[in-house]
Amino acid sequence: MGVQGFQEFLEKRCPGAVVPVDLLKLARTVSRQQQQQHLHRQLPPTAALAPGAPRAARGSVPLQPPLPPAALGAYSGGAGPTRHHHPAHHFHHHGQAQPGLHPPLPPPPPPQLPGARVLVDAGSALPRLYGGYQTDWVCGGQWNAMLGYLSALCQACAYPGGDGLELVVMFPGGLGKDRLAEWGRRCQAERQTAQLIVGHVGNKGTPPPRAWFLPPACLSHCVRLALIRFRVKVFQSLEDHHLEVVAFFRENGFHGLLAHDSEYALYNIPSYYSSHALKLSWNGKNLTTNQFLMQEVAKQLGLKRMNFPIFAALLGNHILPDEDLAAFHWSLLGPEHPLASLKVRAHQLVLPPCDVVIKAVSEYVSSIKDPSNLDVVGKDVFKQSQSRTEDKIERFKKAVEYYSVTTKLSSLPVGPSFLGFRNNRLGNPPLPRNQVGTISAGKPMFSHQVPQKVKYPPPFPVGPNSSLLFSSHALGESHAFSEDPMLQNSPFANWAVSYDSSASQFPNYLPSKASPPLGPDSSHSSSSDGDEPNGASSDHITEAFHHQPEWGNPNRDRGSWAQPVDTGVSEASLGDGEPHIPSLLSMSTRNHMDITIPPLPPVAPEVLRVAEHRHRRGLMYPYIYHVLTKGEIKIPVCIEDECNMELPPAALLFRSARQYVYGVLFSLAETQRKMERLAMRRRLPVEVPSVILKEWSAYKGKSPQTPELVSALTFREWTCPNLKKLWLGKAVEDKNRRMRAFLACMKSDTPSMLNPANVPTHLLLMCCVLRYMVQWPGGRILHRHELDTFLAQAVSTQLYEPDRLQELKIEKLDARGIQLAALFMSGVDTALFANDACGQPVPWEHCCPWIYFDGKLFQSKLIKAGRERVSLVELCDGQADLATKVEKMRQSILEGVNMNHPPPSALLPSPTFVPPMVPSLYPVSLYSRAMGSMPLPPQGRSRGFAGLHPIPPQGGKLEIAGMVVGQWAGSRSSRGRGSFGMQVVSVGGPGKGHGKEQTGRGSKGHKKGNKQGSSDGVSKSLELHQGRSRSQVNGNSGALIKEEKSDHRLPAPSQCALSRDSNECNNGNRYLPMNNREKNHLQEQKLETVAQRKED
């Protein structure tokens, strides 16, 4: 969009408007000025505090109470003493002086006020908050290095003399449906960048260029957790992120905004700093960046700052896209412009360069005689438009209104204020934290966008007492939401709900058509070059997938696409005899194809209050509030090779976990139980309505312009309690249910996962993610050495030495390792989502990735394990005790896992890539198998094409009418193992051409009970254990598990982790004892000897 290129234009073409500044020096200067102003404004204590005397004279400024204990003085590592100034103690001390008895006391020293407060937009400043654009981000993230950078940044801002810089960070927490087209274009660009990254690493083995920076998976939430650890105030937006950032900035008197988004420059922010140029010196004494002088920008462009809204509307934005303004932009250039020949090249829609458009539009806006008459301006802009002229003019007026809302109103209508910050003057501190009242939201500009007033409770304590919010505790003693001191003392009962619970039967149901805050017409923006067929031929897309009464019936069609309504052709063209074909510059553009979902089940008002409360304060995963209120989420893009069919996309890999989380959030299990009881009473069939949600994502074969419909799932093993009890329950059973719900969502509900002797407490979340990845039904994701690498780097002492890891040199990066790291961090992202949805059974201190993962360390150990084939002890830096921990964790991860599922067949659609808009239904422990009996995939990477499986390594024979006419041997690496049968292909006769398998020949064969023929049997030891799936460690092969021959019966379900009957691990899935292992080893040697003799 033209708006997004405005900041780059300022940096390159307006050198006088971009000046370097030192934020720490500015903070100290502002602090001294505030203290001097405080001394001049202060009244005599006797006049101010005499009984019955007024607080201040008319026209004077009342004394502002100082801040509570400083937020930036209690970091880990220490950055200065904590300052305590209590207002009540201050007044009481000076109230003791009585005139006439003693001479008046000297004036007290001025309180130490904060130097300056800067608001940081985390949505555009994530690369700098991560620590910069160093090349190690491609390995999956160096989280301890990021933690060290944020610690140094916070310590530098916390100046010990009271002249520090207070940082307040706001993360994007809104769904942003009105910017969906912009998000889709960004996803397509990130997909292309990911392919460039994978290709570069695969070909050269070196880190990609800095310009290809793609944020590591889960970066936003890792930064949020790190800032919470350092006691930095963190918030999340609720709807429109840009408007809420500007409203929060103006309401609380911040001295500057640190971001990298052109829209903030056009919002007329007083002090706008670039986060892209933010640099922290090595000694922590200088924090430099660039400041944009918008007054100088307006002078160089020949504009008045009051005309910035019209200028922003005509550049192209999310309301009025570039494609709708293409004809206007080309008309400004004129036919004699050197670039005019590009307008009709190959009959395609070509847009002028951004810098050329900015100059031309600025000249046009400066020549407007009456900028207030938007109707005249709109008609002049779209005078060459051949379709939808009125619609474009209306959206032009809405765009002007959108960008002028920040300059017209001092209190923006974007909802209530945050955490006790009130409207105050620039530079003044906020009100004390114990004086928080209701805040008026101002006059609404868009009525359907503005929520009602909400009375917020006192904010959480910041500083030494902030541990009350996230206290360190054991897993079994985790606090529920209701046990939070912030929530206990808050008047939740007096809250005014921001939604009308009596307006509908489903209070949290928001139709997708009304989601954009600027009305339904704002969604007619352009789309990117997606994978959708016929993507540029329709004008307006109406709502599709109308609500069906039998939505839950999988045999029925879930809806049909509505025919596009061509409302763009004018009435004059319809009246002509011949059809009118508009030009490409005036044709309407397609935004996205939304789908209407059935109404969501109702959610308890207490749950929604807690969800909104924690969402605004950055204490909860943002997906949760979106799911409860809108029933849809957006999934970011991560690094994945679209040409590699071995690894699934992250959006599909962790979809099953998200489906279970949806079931937990909407209390689907309790609903089903109530419906079953009601059906039994009335003797009617059970009809449980399905809960359908929308997931917006982009991966191979999936365009971001269309959502996927996903249904919520329930646990089969037990009935999860409702969300209110899961979040607000205080009993010990409720805590156990929270933990069990989290483990069930991650398919890790086994006893050994909660045994600290097997899985350390701080590594529980990591082991749950790895166990989930091991159980992927579409094929094997992790080999054994890769699983050991994840575990070995988690227990390594080098994990907490970022300086040493920074000096670590990796000769050639492993492309598969980069994708595995991205998948793992996407799993951590999903685990954080599940943990917050289940009531946070895992404390936030144990969720942070810097305690169990480092991408660069993982790469170095993966190269040792994969290429150099080192032993497990060498992989653990020569420490046998660490190798023992890795073995125990591996056993816990593989406990009860059935690895006998075959890879997807080439003749059948792969279960890995589900077609769009089809919900992926994967049960808990039962996965659908491909038709026929297929052997396990070969160990290691196959050299064949994806989907084509090599000849079975056990060999086989060809039978015609029951007679063996041909026979072939298998590979020497797997010949004679006896674990899998020989492949038999029968043509004619009883087999009817179907393939079958026969077991290999052992030392003592026996006849199999089969009428068609006989085959070699297995040994008695294998016969004794037939049908059991054992998780046995394979010594030197690359396979993750070596399984014995089974009769394909389902394994016995493993005992749950929190069973009342027993707290011990289930012995039914333990490893084989040593005598059985020795017997199996001898038997394998005998089988191999017999097979070699037979071949000779």
From Swiss-Prot:
Residues 540-559, 1041-1050, 1076-1096 have a biased composition (Basic and acidic residues). GO terms for molecular function: RNA binding. One of its GO terms (cellular component) is nucleus. Keywords: Isopeptide bond, Methylation, Ubl conjugation. Residues 35-59 have a biased composition (Low complexity). Residues 35-113, 508-579, 971-1096 are annotated as: Disordered. Residues 82-95 have a biased composition (Basic residues). Residues 101-113 have a biased composition (Pro residues). There is a cross-link at K1042 (Glycyl lysine isopeptide (Lys-Gly) (interchain with G-Cter in SUMO2)). The modification Omega-N-methylarginine is found at R58, R977. InterPro entries: Coact_PPARg (IPR026784), PIN-like_dom_sf (IPR029060). Expressed at low levels in a number of tissues. Belongs to the constitutive coactivator of PPAR-gamma family. PANTHER family: CONSTITUTIVE COACTIVATOR OF PEROXISOME PROLIFERATOR-ACTIVATED RECEPTOR GAMMA, CONSTITUTIVE COACTIVATOR OF PPAR-GAMMA-LIKE PROTEIN 2. This is Constitutive coactivator of PPAR-gamma-like protein 2. It comes from Homo sapiens. The lineage of its organism: Eukaryota, Metazoa, Chordata, Craniata, Vertebrata.
